[in-house]
């Protein structure tokens, strides 16, 4: 049997310059995050807001369930969409709901959409060293009754938008929203206010298109429509393969 020196020696090779693997401590890696797929989207109108998500919960090429909507009703005027690691989504929404109950008992009123967004920012920032693996989008009505959408990064930075997509198919949905809702970089186009009917048609169309291309998005589309009358839900079937 050849020695290691004989095996790796060759003309012109200086073994003194070769990297050597030294014995070291055994390292155990902790990887708590799993991406469970799914896509969320929110659009704000003049007097309404829409928060939508698909219902597929998957891991790799396995589908855990086909009925796991990612839209969570927080108040009569606010809905949050969460996508990413499903365990963190559930934990985060339970924390938010507990904070909202405490606020209502203390102040005898529901928290506003803007205040919920600010609260979520502090919750996410408090976990900045071990962040929740969640894409968060809040949609609802502000204090003036106008539609509002707030998008977040994993550690709490947030901003108010008119529309936003997040999750596995966000790279496909966001350009469509930029074009059809935001009219970004378009010339000689009249910026017509978005009606609820047109927004609903657009949400359905973009999710149908996303389900054709993204394996982590599909099964069904759950749409939450927030108006001054309250929140109503609508479900649309998507492809299931």
UniProtKB/Swiss-Prot annotation:
Subcellular location: Cytoplasm; Nucleus
CDD domains to which the protein is assigned, alphabetical: proteasome_beta_type_1
Modified residues (Phosphoserine): 62, 68, 162
Modification type Phosphotyrosine: residues: 150
Domain of life of the source: Eukaryota
Phenotype when changing residue 103 to H: In NEDMHAL; uncertain significance; results in impaired proteasome assembly
Keywords carried by this UniProt record: Acetylation, Cytoplasm, Deafness, Glycoprotein, Host-virus interaction, Intellectual disability, Nucleus, Phosphoprotein, Proteasome
Propeptide feature: residues: 1-28
Any one of the GO CC terms: extracellular region
Positions of post-translational N6-acetyllysine modification: 204
Similarity remark: Belongs to the peptidase T1B family.
Function text: Non-catalytic component of the 20S core proteasome complex involved in the proteolytic degradation of most intracellular proteins. This complex plays numerous essential roles within the cell by associating with different regulatory particles. Associated with two 19S regulatory particles, forms the 26S proteasome and thus participates in the ATP-dependent degradation of ubiquitinated proteins.
Name listed for the protein in its UniProt record: Proteasome subunit beta type-1
Gene: PSMB1
């Amino acid at each position: 049997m050849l020695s290691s020196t004989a095996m790796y020696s060759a003309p012109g090779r200086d073994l003194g310059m070769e990297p050597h693997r030294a014995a070291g401590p055994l390292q155990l890696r902790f990887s708590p995050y799993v991406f469970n797929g799914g896509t969320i989207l929110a659009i704000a109108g003049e007097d309404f807001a829409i928060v939508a998500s698909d219902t597929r919960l998957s891991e790799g090429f396995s589908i855990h369930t086909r009925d796991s909507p990612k839209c969570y009703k927080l108040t009569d005027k606010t809905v949050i969409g969460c996508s990413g690691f499903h365990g963190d989504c559930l934990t985060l929404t339970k924390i938010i709901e507990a904070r909202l109950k405490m606020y209502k008992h203390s102040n005898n009123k529901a928290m506003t959409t803007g205040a919920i967004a600010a609260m979520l920012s502090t919750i996410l920032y408090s976990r900045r060293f071990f962040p929740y693996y969640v894409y968060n989008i809040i949609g609802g009505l502000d204090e003036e009754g106008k539609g509002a959408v707030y998008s977040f990064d994993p550690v709490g930075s947030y901003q108010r938008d008119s529309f936003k997509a997040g999750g596995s198919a966000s790279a496909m949905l966001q350009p469509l929203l930029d074009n059809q809702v935001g009219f970004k970089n378009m010339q000689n186009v009249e910026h017509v206010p978005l009606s609820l009917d047109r927004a609903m048609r657009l949400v359905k169309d973009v999710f149908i298109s996303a389900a054709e291309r993204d394996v982590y998005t599909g099964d069904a589309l759950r749409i939450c429509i927030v108006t001054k009358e309250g929140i109503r839900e609508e479900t649309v079937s998507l492809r299931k393969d």
